[in-house]
Design a protein with these regions (language model features):
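Short amphipathic alpha-helix that is part of the acyltransferase structural core
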Residues: 1-20, 107-152
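A short helix-loop-beta-strand connector motif used in the catalytic cores of GNAT acetyltransferases and
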Residues: 27-40, 50, 153-162, 184
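Acyl-donor-binding surface of acyltransferase catalytic domains
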Residues: 30-135, 245-246
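Conserved acetyl-CoA-binding loop-helix of GNAT-fold acetyltransferases
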Residues: 62-67, 186, 196-210, 229, ...
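Conserved active-site alpha-helix within GNAT-family acetyltransferase domains
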Residues: 83-93, 223-241
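A conserved beta-strand-loop-helix scaffold within acyl/acetyltransferase catalytic domains
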Residues: 151-191
Length: 341
């Protein structure tokens, strides 16, 4: 059986060698972090869980590798043995590569200030206050930067962040994804239409300077090489690659043998009523429904719909939920895409 461990000191030695700040947050009992074990008295294995990541330590344990706390998305093994066990227990997980960044960076304040000052005309940087927090929570691209705190009040008390503002709206956000006593873990997100303008570098540099002013360390972990390059521009150094097993809660609710009688009626073209009025095309291929569109970077996308109800579907590796009506496709419950054909 899997138990939540309150006395985190019992597993501190198991996590010796871990450099991820989320593990540090868990061992310090910060935010809504959890430590899970299968032996409360003498744990030889442990899972540290915070935000949407689970980190394993100690002896490989099948119960822990099979356990999925609510909200978990990424499982990070500490050894090949743990990785093999996760693959056995989570066969639908998608293995991805993440990039660790060295701790203890020696930042050049002058360089950071130059990046802040290079903010393009028409933009300004604002610290995230209550109003900006609310806006971030309402925008899918920025929600993850602030949502892992228990409340807005907790974020404003414990966290920190800055946003590049254009026409009164946030377009790039650097924020504390999580916190630990000695610092924060940085999350950076920029709207697709606002990328390659130096906005991410500017808001990240401003956040790092804020941390340095208050004696906090701004920890960084990268999901892709673009993030690594940005980190290096800011003064960090790349450390190493590591595996992460990406789960999707959607798979737990997918209907395995759906009634496809009405699926042909869902096919056709739909117009997205916001942004660039993008056209979505829904079609059947090999008995499954697919969504076809061209993203904002001009790249064709072909995504499979996964049935979760008679007329409801989800997309893997995202929170999007789609419902069909006779004359529309409804995205996430409120964006109505009118059927054109």
């Amino acid at each position: 059986m899997v138990y939540e461990l309150k006395d985190t000191s019992k597993v501190k030695d198991l996590f010796t060698g871990s450099v991820d700040s989320l593990v540090t947050s868990c061992l310090q009992g910060m935010m809504d972090s959890k430590i899970y074990v299968t032996d409360l008295e003498n744990p030889r294995s442990a899972m540290a869980f915070l935000a949407c990541f689970a980190f394993f330590a100690g002896e490989p344990d099948r119960e822990l590798a099979s356990f999925k706390p609510k909200g978990v998305v990424g499982m990070v093994p500490c050894s090949e043995a743990w990785a093999k066990l996760i693959e056995e227990c989570q066969p639908d997980a998608d293995k991805v590569t993440r990039y660790a960044i060295k701790k203890g960076a020696k930042f050049d304040r002058a360089n950071l200030q130059r990046l802040v000052d290079a903010l393009p005309e028409g933009y300004e940087i604002q610290r995230i206050d209550g109003a900006l927090y609310d806006k971030c929570m309402e925008i899918d691209d920025f929600e993850d930067a602030v949502c892992h705190f228990a409340s807005k009040e907790q974020y404003l008390e414990m966290g920190r962040g800055f946003a590049a503002i254009k026409d009164g709206e946030p377009v790039s956000v650097a924020s504390s994804y999580t916190v630990y006593r000695e610092g924060i873990e940085i999350e950076i997100d920029t709207l697709e239409s606002e990328r390659r303008k130096g906005l991410a570098a500017a808001v990240c540099a401003r956040l790092i300077l804020s941390c340095l002013d208050d004696g906090l360390y701004p920890s960084w972990d990268a999901a892709n090489m673009n993030s690594v390059h940005l980190a290096e521009k800011l003064g960090y150094e790349f450390s190493h690659e590591y595996p992460c097993y990406w789960l999707d809660a959607l798979l737990d609710i997918v209907i395995q043998d759906p009634d496809k009688t009405n699926w042909p009626s869902f096919c056709g073209e739909y117009e997205l009523p916001i942004k660039d009025h993008r056209i979505y095309e829904v079609s059947l291929k090999d008995g499954d429904l697919y969504l076809h569109f061209v993203n904002s970077e001009g790249k064709p996308m072909d995504l499979k719909f996964w049935p979760i109800g008679p007329d409801a579907f989800g997309l893997l590796w995202g929170d999007d939920r789609i419902t069909f009506t006779p004359d529309a496709l409804i995205l996430d419950g409120d964006v109505v895409c009118k059927k054109l054909s």
